[in-house]
Amino acid sequence: MPRTRPAPIVLSVGGSLLRSGDPARDGAYFAALATLLGRVGRQRPLVVTTGGGQTAREYIGLGRRLGLTEVELDELGIEVTRLHARLLAARLGPPTPAHPPASVREVVAALAHASPVILGGTEPGHTTDGVAALVAARLRAEAVVNATDVDGIYSADPRHRPAARRFDRLDWEQLRAMVVRDTSGGAGQHFPFDRLGVETLDRAGIPLRVVDGRDLVNLGRALRGERFAGTNVTGRAR
Ligand code: UTP
């Protein structure tokens, strides 16, 4: 009888987790994250997207001063996300591809031989959250895990509004309303989870788990489908 392969899982790591401004802290984080991803990736097919964070915003800001177009600014952002993917992939070593796949199609091909597969951005106009969602839809993934620098989705930004409350569970309509409220679509903006990601996962009926990626024990739980602290976004597929 054929052995059933566990369903793939897709992780989107926010750039703010990868570049804090403190090289010693970032080195330790990359190393510990790579260890966790290697372990989970051996148990099931795992795809990871890496964000560009503050570094991407710095390059996009510089490009904007130089009068670059929005598409050119997005392309700068993509280069930074790919740099972060390369760092993580190189730490993991073969068979994880050292050169991050540049499209969803390339991810599918790479995953036939390696897990985890790490990539950055692909096309101008969205973020690595959107890439993670597109990959998940193509792979019929069990879930997307979004690792960020807050421990879930709040009613308002908890860094500025101490009274904001964390949602344990949201449906897609609620998350869509929050994303639309907080974004206008320019290059380098900071989204809770990007619009393309919300639309793609809602259509595909794939749940989203939002967790604090600084807590690698909790991140491991979210990746393995165990109980985790954070926000679960679910809803009926349309
Ligand atoms: P990020 O995915 O890092 O976006 O891509 P972000 O919203 O800044 O997320 P955090 O802060 O890392 O969590 C950085 C920028 O690169 C461009 C966009 O301009 C994005 O804002 N980008 C990225 C693309 O145009 N396409 C992609 O597929 C990925």
Regions found by a protein language model. Give the residues of each.
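C-terminal catalytic "cap/lid" subdomain
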Residues: 1-238
